[in-house]
A protein has these predicted regions:
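Catalytic-core region of right-hand nucleic acid polymerases
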Residues: 25-26, 38
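Short, conserved phosphate-binding/catalytic loop or strand-edge motifs used
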Residues: 106-109, 146-153
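C-terminal nucleotide
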Residues: 1-14, 18-19, 32, 36-96, ...
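DPxDG-like acidic metal-binding loop motif
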Residues: 117-139
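Short pre-catalytic strand/loop immediately N-terminal to key active-site residues, enriched for Gly-Thr
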Residues: 110-116, 317
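Long, low-complexity C-terminal extensions of enzymes
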Residues: 324-325
Length: 375
């Protein structure tokens, strides 16, 4: 049998980066109907592939390994897929047994802009884990979606040394609009020694989100951003726990970000778009100041701030980063029907600023997260 899978991108509406990166607080997040996918089918050994669907001009990438090969070496080629195989092999005795007896071809693709702040790198890890679970018919209780999300975080953080939290690993699997609670996950301990994320779906009460998203085309690595900010947070937080007194700057920034998340949940359920927009603006102000405090000369990134300021000047209710700053993406919450005005304004400033790779789109909410089809 062959299995086709897709998972959606994500944005953090409010609360970022409190997903156990800089603080274990909460985010209000949404899955977007922009997807990455995979095909898993029988093969002689293990074949990993990246199918190019963009205009980058880069050739497809294909790697082949002998049956049951472990560990797969990290060399900069398809390391996210290799990391998923290695981590699942380490975690699951059932997978180890079946993997040695049956080969698989795992081919992946994506429509999510590269380094766009939409959780794109994590999608490959999730597709690999979910694809292998389906192909090898692994126990669905022992390998449930919460476990896969947690394994995906360890693939990036432990296997590959990428500083990351948990939103990018949960939202694509579970989908919808949700309030995510990350309490007691700051230290990112071993699987089973800390809580799973609490994933509270809200889209039964939220018909749609009037959003416009822009990927700036400015390359950045979210791991590089958090690699500077997370150690600063942990250092200040640990010292504060010992000495007491007034909270240090990083703790104040993130306590404020958490307030935008829980207050945003209340406003979102009430359909109070102006209040949600105001909280988005406050969240972005905090992140911009925090990044400046952590040594990023242009705060959340000059291109991001340009698009955010332009959106607000053209009537958006709120605008902020989708995830980590530097490059990546920004998004705006608008009055329903005003999407075209923001798109036109962004197209104009992108042309003026020479951001020729900027990609602007109006996303729908992906109410289904992981989709698996059997052929």
């Amino acid at each position: 049998m062959r299995y086709r899978l897709t998972v959606p991108a994500r944005i953090n509406l409010l609360g970022n980066p409190g997903d156990a990166n800089e603080g274990d607080f909460a985010t209000l997040s949404a899955a977007l109907e922009v997807r990455a996918g995979a095909l898993v089918e029988p093969a002689e050994g293990l074949t990993l592939e990246m199918i190019r669907r963009d205009d980058s001009g880069l050739p497809p990438l294909r790697l082949e390994f002998r049956p049951g090969a472990h560990p797969l070496p990290y060399d900069g080629q398809l390391d996210l897929l290799k990391g998923a195989v290695n981590r699942l092999y380490q975690h699951s005795a059932e997978f180890r047994d079946k993997f040695t007896r049956r080969g698989a071809r795992l081919a992946t693709w994506t429509d999510v802009p590269r380094q766009s702040g939409l959780g794109g790198s994590s999608l490959f890890v999730l597709l690999a884990l979910a694809g292998l679970r389906a192909f090898y018919d692994l126990d669905s209780g022992a390998h449930n979606d919460y476990v896969l999300a947690e394994l995906a975080q360890r693939v990036e953080a432990v296997e590959l040394g990428i500083t990351c939290g948990f939103a990018d690993r949960y939202v694509p699997l579970f989908g919808g609009v949700a309030y995510l609670d990350y309490r007691d996950k700051l230290q990112q301990r071993d699987l089973g020694t800390e809580p799973f994320v609490t994933y509270e779906r809200l889209d039964n009460w939220v018909a749609d989100l009037p959003l416009v998203v822009v990927s700036s085309g400015v390359a950045r690595d979210s791991g590089d951003v958090h690699a500077r900010m997370r150690p600063r947070y942990l250092q200040e937080h640990e010292a504060w726990q010992v000495r007491g007194g007034e909270p240090p700057p990083m703790a104040r920034f993130m306590a404020g970000a958490w307030q935008t998340a829980w207050r945003g949940k209340i406003a979102l359920l009430a359909g109070d778009w102006p209040a949600v927009g105001a909280l988005m603006n406050e969240n972005h102000r905090l992140v911009n100041e925090m990044m400046t405090y952590c040594g990023f000369a242009d705060g959340a990134g000059w291109a991001n701030n340009l698009f955010i300021e332009t959106a607000l000047a053209n009537g958006a209710l709120g605008a902020k980063l989708t995830g980590a700053g530097g490059g990546g993406s920004a998004f705006a919450l608008v009055h329903p029907g005003d999407e075209g005005r923001i798109v036109a304004a962004w197209q104009r400033v992108a042309a003026e600023a020479g951001l020729t790779k900027a990609h602007i789109f109006r996303p729908g909410i992906a109410r289904r997260g992981l989709v698996v089809e059997v052929e």
